[in-house]
Every structure is written in C-alpha cells, then in structure tokens.
Amino acid sequence: MTEKHTLRLADPSAIDSIISVDEFLQIKEQYDAEQPLITLQTKFNLAWALVRSDSTQHVQQGLSLFCSIYKDSPERRLECLYYIALSHYKLKQYEESRRYLNMLLSKDPNSPEALKLKNRLYDAVTKEGYIGMVVVAGAVVSVAALVGWASKRLFSKRRP
C-alpha cells in the first residue's frame, strides 16, 4: 500500500521570489500585535516571511524561528524540517539543507515538495562543483603562467 502525502508545503520555487514589503509589514504587524502571546501560526508566518526576504540576516532569523517551532511544537515538526531545509538551501548551506531534507524524507518519502527540493539541491551542488572546478583550473593556469613568466625573466637575465 502506498503512503499518501498529507503535508501542505510551499513549492521550493517560492524561495526564489522575494516577499513584498507590504506583505512583510502586514505579517510583522500581526506578530507585534500578538505580543507577548504569539500564536504558533503567526510565528510560523513570520518565519516564512523572513526566509523569503532578500536579506541574509532575515533568512537566518526565519531559520531560527523555524528551529524554535520545531523544538516547541511536535505537531509541526515535519513541516518545519522542510522549511529548515529550504532556509539552509537559500543560505547555500547545502549540507545542512540535505541533512534536514533527509530527515523529512525518512518520515515522508512521498512529499512532492521535498522531492523537488532534493532535485534543486542536487542541481545547486553540481553547479557549485563545476564552478569550483573552473575556479581551481583558472588558478592553476594563472600560477603556471606566472611561474613560466618568472622563469623566463630569471633565465634571460643570467645569460652573458
């Protein structure tokens, strides 16, 4: 019997679009209005809004909120695993993203959103690997050219 997927998660591509200032302010106002007894959903909404920001600091704050929700609310743990993985992905912390994503997939292997994120993660790691190889190759060529140039100058000065 195939396990049916039940979690409702944002598509991983949602991380690519930046939250509007108006939407962020609306969520932040709701969060502030509920002080000191903030509902779990409002805290979650703020975390998601922060992660969709273009500010690394905001993304880190959102990640921290998701981790707090994960710790304090067992009923939202699977959902939080996904958003923690997505947050790490946005921060380009791919190993951490993979770790949380694997935790989620071990509990919910049929999650379409998690499987999409897994593919995006693979593509990002592959792309970074290629970029890394190009950078290293460029550095090797530069060093070789510099050594060649220095050797030529050194040996050309030695001749009588």
Curated annotation (Swiss-Prot):
Residues 1-129 are cytoplasmic. Residues 151-160 are mitochondrial intermembrane. It comes from the Eukaryota. It is a single-pass membrane protein. GO terms for molecular function: lipid binding; molecular adaptor activity; protein-membrane adaptor activity. GO terms for biological process: mitochondrial fission; mitochondrial membrane fission; peroxisome fission. It is found in: Mitochondrion outer membrane. InterPro entries: Fis1, Fis1_cytosol, Fis1_TPR_C, Fis1_TPR_N, TPR-like_helical_dom_sf. TPR repeats lie at residues 78-111. GO terms for cellular component: cytoplasm; cytoplasmic side of mitochondrial outer membrane; mitochondrial outer membrane; peroxisomal membrane. Keywords: Membrane, Mitochondrion, Mitochondrion outer membrane, Repeat, TPR repeat, Transmembrane, Transmembrane helix. The keyword Mitochondrion applies. It holds the Pfam family Fis1_TPR_N. Has a role in mitochondrial fission. Has a role in outer membrane fission but not matrix separation. The C-terminus is required for mitochondrial localization, while the N-terminus is necessary for mitochondrial fission. Belongs to the FIS1 family. This is Mitochondrial fission 1 protein. The gene is fis1.
